[in-house]
Amino acid sequence: MTSAAVTVSLEDLKNGNVSFQTLVDAFGPDSLGIIVVKDVPEEFVQLRHRLLSYSSYLGNLPQFRLDKIENPASKYLTGWSRGKETLKNGQIDTHKGSFYANCAFYVDPSLDCAKPTEEFSPANFPEYLSPNLWPSNIAGFKETFEDLCRLIIDTAVLVARACDQYASKEIPDYKPGYLEHVVKTSTTTKARLLHYFPADADAKEESNDDDWCATHLDHGCLTGLTSAMFINETKQVPAIPITYSYNPRYLPTLAELDSSPDPTAGLYIQSRSGETVQVKIPRDCIAFQTGEALERITKGKFKAVPHYVRGVRPGVAGGENDGAKIARNTLAVFTQPNLGEIVDLDQDISFGEFARGIVEKNTTK
């Protein structure tokens, strides 16, 4: 089934006009665990289109260039990866390509990764303390990536502020302003640009619903999401021109399909009642879903949301897209506490300790 997520305006967030009931409807025990923010700054639409176009350019680079931006030591939590995660059935996930970047630049433009602590160093926790690996010779990629992430994190700060107002009233001993502080000051926030490769026309359709991205919980606080962009990569091959007669600031944006050629492709959430719900995010909006750290910080008042993603099935596109290679691109920004921040007061667990266990569980051996 398809369901509309709770929607609020950016202006209401800025003015503190989001009611507690709205937050409970969005994030509470009986919710989908997702909120959509509308009326975001105008530049968001342009930045989204440009960065999600870059996702196809990146995914179609020659393998030798992609190899240069892989970082196995970080368990692929910086740079490019493909085929480094496992699906529910134990198979290696080659359906999607992933580019991770640290968003420490939001706090300090000179930072390329999280700040080390006494407990966590680049040697013992490279997953969060390895510097970014930006692809070379992709004009405007880094600039666009950082600009879009800043805008999304700015909005996440406002969502966090609204959550704090609720938590201060409803949770005993809650530290006022804690979640906003976490989102605004964190150097561990990460962004993930995703490229779901066009399905092989000869591939057999999987019977499992979550065959493209196994059902999981995000382990941060609030995950900012763009709507997905669908691209016909047969009609417009996303190859970077070898030479330009001038030095462009950005690569050309790619044409976005009006809608997904496969109505089953997209983001799915498992509701609290056990139903599987498809959630659609408008192109000019930013969605935020809850992660495990937020559930712990709010002592279960706000629940982490189990979710998965399906790409476009082979052979379902019709009309002018019949037989075409259809890619799905999107961006997720995981706002997370600093490594030393306590996310579970009862058990005295820091985010670094919590994240280390999650990363170990999710990475292929």
Where are the regions a protein language model picked out?
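Peripheral, non-catalytic segments flanking oxidoreductase cores
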Residues: 1-365
